A protein has these predicted regions:
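N-terminal secretory signal peptides
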Residues: 1-14, 21, 29, 37-38
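C-terminal regulatory/interaction regions
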Residues: 3, 14-21, 308-355
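C-terminal segment of N-terminal export signals and the immediately downstream linker at the start
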Residues: 30-72
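Conserved beta-strand hairpin/beta-sheet module of binuclear metal-dependent hydrolase folds
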Residues: 68-113, 219-223, 227-232
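Active-site metal-binding motif and surrounding structural segment of the metallo-beta-lactamase
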Residues: 69, 92-93, 104-148
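Metallo-beta-lactamase
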Residues: 71, 94-95, 102-104, 154-210, 216, 225, ...
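Divalent metal-coordination and catalytic microenvironments
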Residues: 75, 89, 99, 128, ...
Length: 355
């Protein structure tokens, strides 16, 4: 066999100095793509749909997004579209696929993978547990691929979850998606705790877990020879991120993850975002700086004794919304709910900012 797998039992990355979370920090929660929950009869609804109905709508909306193909290196291709971005290392040793789109996009994903050549998919790498990244695990495993992820991805996919989202209907109501435990065939067959290294197709690629950021299951994949980094939802390029506090996400962790990746990227690194266009070091730096600004503004309001409603009334993101809230399409002004991130549980602060 032409590839080898070297599992490195390196020490866990040091936790952030001081507090790793910030009570009252802002969760800039916008589910993607930009117009995901706009349009259709939902805009006239008085209440958000049921979690099951909302999930079906979400998958359908994601699946309506066209898929685009972009060559990143001789052996690396990015598919951008129905559920974010998929990165593929392809060569005589087989295909190594990072993330998998949403379930309804499987026929298109399969066609795109087949279009890269006849080599089989050897490994599927989940950057975290969310459905728009791991929905097609079972399909790919059925073709003979091994699904590889951080151990918390298996943990989270094995549990029921209610994932809070910002419903973008007429009333901007807070809603949630419900997930039952995933079937056994969709779960990763191989996991790691801290880091893992693969070598194939002339490439060395390192998988690295980070402290809780978007979730507690996040990893990034660094294709070292090609100078490509696939970040999953540790990076939303040009837009406010979605942070999942119910499974460990924190804005402080997102900042720390960006800092970690900036420390290994250079000015020529191609950075695949979980959502948004292909990025680079400058794009990631801008996103990191926006998160720092957002966190610090909310902390200042909290330290001044403002309640969540009072903080929202201050419109702390008025100058950020036109840049980060507009994303890639014209739409309503962004709305950002305030959350407490001092625990992994969602706090009861559902006030919305914006007009």
């Amino acid at each position: 066999m032409k590839f080898d797998f070297l599992q490195k039992q390196t020490s866990r990355r040091e936790m952030l100095q001081g507090s790793t979370t910030l009570a009252g920090s802002v969760l800039l929660a916008h589910l993607l793509p930009a117009t995901l929950l706009r349009g259709s009869a939902m805009d006239n609804a008085q209440r958000a749909p049921s979690p099951a109905a909302l999930l079906a709508i979400m998958r359908g909306k994601f699946n309506a997004v066209p898929m685009e193909t972009q060559k990143l290196a001789d052996t690396i291709t990015m598919f951008d579209g129905p559920g974010g971005a998929v990165t593929v290392l392809n060569g005589p040793d087989g295909k190594f696929v990072v993330d998998t789109f949403v379930a309804p996009a499987w026929p298109r994903l399969k066609e795109a993978l087949d279009g890269l050549g006849s080599a089989p998919v050897k490994y599927v790498i989940d950057t975290h547990w969310h459905f728009d990244h791991a929905d097609n695990n079972a399909h790919l495993h059925a073709t003979g691929a091994t699904v590889l992820a951080h151990e918390n991805t298996t943990k989270r996919m094995s549990e029921p979850h209610d994932l809070p989202v910002l419903y973008r209907g007429a009333d901007g109501a807070l809603a949630s998606l419900h997930f039952d435990p995933s079937p056994a065939e969709a779960l990763p067959q191989q996991t790691f705790a801290t880091s893992y290294e693969l070598r194939a197709n002339g490439e060395t690629f390192a998988l690295q877990h980070v402290a809780p950021a978007h979730t507690d299951s996040d990893i990034y994949v660094h294709f070292q020879n090609a100078n490509v980094i696939s970040m999953g939802d540790l990076f939303f390029n040009g837009m406010y991120p979605y942070i999942d506090p119910g499974t460990g996400g924190t804005i402080t962790g997102m900042i720390a993850a960006a800092d970690k990746i900036l420390s290994v990227a250079d000015n020529h690194t191609k950075i695949v975002a979980g959502h948004g266009p292909l990025g680079n070091r400058a794009d990631l730096t801008k996103s990191r700086d926006m998160l720092i600004t957002s966190r610090d503004r909310v902390q200042k309001l909290k330290s001044a004794g403002k309640s969540a409603l009072e903080a929202v009334a201050e419109k702390p993101f008025a100058d950020l919304d036109p840049v980060w809230g507009e994303r890639r399409r014209q739409r309503r002004p962004a709305r950002a709910p305030l959350w407490n991130l001092d625990t992994t549980n969602l706090r009861n602060s559902t006030a919305l900012a914006g007009t």
